[in-house]
Amino acid sequence: MNPERKTPERRSRKARRTRDALAQAAFELVLDRGLRNVTVEEIAERADVDRRTFSRYFTSKEAAVLDSLRGDGDRINDALRARPADEPPLTAYRRAVQDWLEAPGAQAWHRRERIFDLLVLAEQEPTLYAAFHHIRVDAQEDSVAIVADRLGVDPRRDIRPAVTVAAGAGALLAAQAAWARAGQPDDLPRLIGQAFDALAGELLAQPPAGQAQHSTTEGSTES
């Protein structure tokens, strides 16, 4: 090992351990007690650091609680980069999500302990939901850049990458919300498949004549 790099590498590993300890402490305390019953000071104490150290790694307890979810967007984007170049953009996004669900090395949400409980809590707590939204937006910005690169376009001038990611990420979000409401931890893959099927198929189809007439009649009655 290069002696000049030894100290920075050690510092990096120590910083990673400290961040992980804070995130794990926040995760456990919030799921055990509830978000409103946990303070930043208690999280820092559980991780055996002080309040100032917490603030070097996280801006809020919500950010610390959700830190374990940040890597999932990166994994989906890594899978998206690896998809065949000739796949249509939305198909590539869907299959990247599928790759993330099935990857044995990096467990997706439904195979990680208590992630289901965390996402249920995020649906109930506005500040936690807002923090989760920021994580999703960061991942989606990277997804847009990847799709733009696949298409060979500038995402500032061509709307297709943003539309692709908005549609795919919207399907994933709808499935995640349905998963949190359903109370079935193992049901996530089915719900994600159902959401993408709806996006690719029935939502683009013309409704049957009877159904269309029924909708028109209902609208006339309400007005």
Task: Map each language-model feature to its residues.
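Hydrophobic/aromatic-rich alpha-helical bundle segments in the mid-to-C-terminal region
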Residues: 150-196, 211
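Hydrophobic/aromatic residues within well-ordered alpha-helical segments
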Residues: 18, 72, 97, 135-139, ...
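HTH DNA-binding helix-turn interface
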Residues: 34-35, 48, 55-66, 71
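Amphipathic alpha-helical packing segments from all-alpha helical-bundle domains
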Residues: 119, 126-151, 159-166
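Hydrophobic alpha-helical connector segments
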Residues: 74-117
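Basic, helix-initiating cap at the start of DNA-binding domains
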Residues: 1-49, 190
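Append "Primarily bacterial transcriptional regulators
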Residues: 42-45, 54, 93
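N-terminal intrinsically disordered/low-complexity leader segments
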Residues: 1-15, 157, 203-223
